[in-house]
Curated annotation (Swiss-Prot):
Its main location: secreted. It is found in: Secreted. Pfam families: FGF. GO terms for molecular function: growth factor activity. This is Fibroblast growth factor 4. It comes from Mus musculus (Mouse).
């Protein structure tokens, strides 16, 4: 007697099993505990970069935490240098020890990653130093290894095509560099002042 082919009752479980295996492969965890499919997506990328600094044993089971930021700004991350046309002209830089300042030449510490965290709000991340730019409640700029609310800046396009970066946590405080390339306190400047004007450029 000829053998009968697989019945519908046996095919369905096999198909479902194949789908489950395929989905599991797509969600395979990366070495630092984050999921490949979630790295770099808005808040997920920020959280992933912060959690990557923790020892593996200290990382939570699911490091890539989903948030309500949404994925509508996906793929808009920019590698830029922020140029402030004061004094001899300075690029914002994030030093390896977390200090923020200005440097005239293009350096590895002046290469920044601007990432959207919500509409009109970005984080500024030092590619070489691995520190986020943050602003304290007193208007002081400093670098931190972990993403917090103090790392959020409203990116405001000015009439001269430069940008101003206002602290999201402390409205009315702006990122600024002096004519000597030092940071100025955000509560002592305004967007009408040239020291707060930054041009994102490659």
């Amino acid at each position: 007697m000829a053998k009968r082919g697989p019945t519908t009752g046996t095919l369905l479980p096999r198909v479902l099993l194949a789908l489950v295996v395929a989905l599991a492969d797509r969600g395979t965890a990366a070495p630092n505990g984050t999921r490949h499919a979630e790295l770099g997506h808005g808040w997920d990328g920020l959280v992933a970069r912060s959690l990557a600094r923790l020892p593996v044993a200290a990382q939570p089971p699911q490091a890539a935490v989903r948030s309500g930021a949404g994925d509508y700004l996906l793929g808009l991350k920019r590698l830029r240098r922020l140029y402030c046309n004061v004094g001899i002209g300075f690029h914002l830089q994030v030093l390896p020890d977390g200090r923020i300042g200005g440097v005239h030449a293009d350096t590895r510490d002046s290469l920044l990653e601007l990432s959207p965290v919500q509409r009109g709000v970005v984080s500024i991340f030092g590619v070489a130093s691995r520190f986020f730019v943050a602003m304290s409640s007193r208007g002081k700029l400093f670098g931190v290894p972990f993403f917090t609310d103090e790392c959020k800046f409203k990116e405001i396009l000015l009439p001269n095509n430069y940008n101003a970066y206002e602290s999201y946590a402390y409205p009315g405080m702006f990122m600024a560099l002096s004519k000597n390339g030092r940071t100025k306190k955000g509560n002592r400047v305004s967007p009408t002042m040239k020291v707060t004007h930054f041009l994102p450029r490659l």
